[in-house]
Amino acid sequence: MAVYGIVATVLVLLLLGDASDVEATGRIIGGSDQLIRNAPWQVSIQISARHECGGVIYSKEIIITAGHCLHERSVTLMKVRVGAQNHNYGGTLVPVAAYKVHEQFDSRFLHYDIAVLRLSTPLTFGLSTRAINLASTSPSGGTTVTVTGWGHTDNGALSDSLQKAQLQIIDRGECASQKFGYGADFVGEETICAASTDADACTGDSGGPLVASSQLVGIVSWGYRCADDNYPGVYADVAILRPWIVKAANAI
């Protein structure tokens, strides 16, 4: 699993003392094509006219994504592509009016890695563009979840078409234990972990949705290497962060 974004480089140096395995771009490993009408809440966040991160439709005006995707970036450079099978064409491209990153976001450890943005014009919902409900309880260990995004595929190239992969939730305590390679300092109380043999999500998928039973349970945050059994994917826990999401969405 690659580290999801340049902001996590310090984290890798602290964790392993060696940044040689850091990948500048990542991928959904072991994924398959996902029709946008089967994940109509998925969006592509574009910065300087290219895909930067995934995002999730919360309402006609609000998108949820990872904090590190927007942190200290200029809103004038941001647009969101919605209702598109491909990140680089189709659907509707909407400018961003404003965004808010969680006040406790930590770019060093990627704790509280959550943000919301407000679109300049409201979306029109349809088969390929729709909001998703937020989970009210954190998923238990062993829950099957689906992650989607346009990150690089197994051949190392950015995927033009939306991809999906099925994973299983790993209990937070287990993820932070010596069974895996992170430790308690890196797996915060506001995170959940998920993994599967030969399947994973990485950099280009940051900010995208982790879904169970048609509810948003997580936001792709960070990890190390791709589909490495010792390093599960780490996601912002939507149930834990739900009060902040609702408040920020109403205030922005």
UniProtKB/Swiss-Prot annotation:
| Active site feature | 68, 113, 206
Q: Which family does it belong to?
A: Belongs to the peptidase S1 family.
According to the entry, every stretch annotated as the Peptidase S1 domain falls at 28-250
- Swiss-Prot/TrEMBL site (Required for specificity) positions: 200
Instruction: Provide the species name.
Output: Drosophila melanogaster
- Locations listed in the record: Secreted, Extracellular space
Which domain of life does the protein's organism represent?
Answer: Eukaryota
Q: What GO cellular component term, any one, is given?
A: extracellular region
Coiled coil found in the keyword field: no
Name of this protein:
Trypsin iota
Query: What positions belong to the pro-peptide in this record?
Result: 20-27
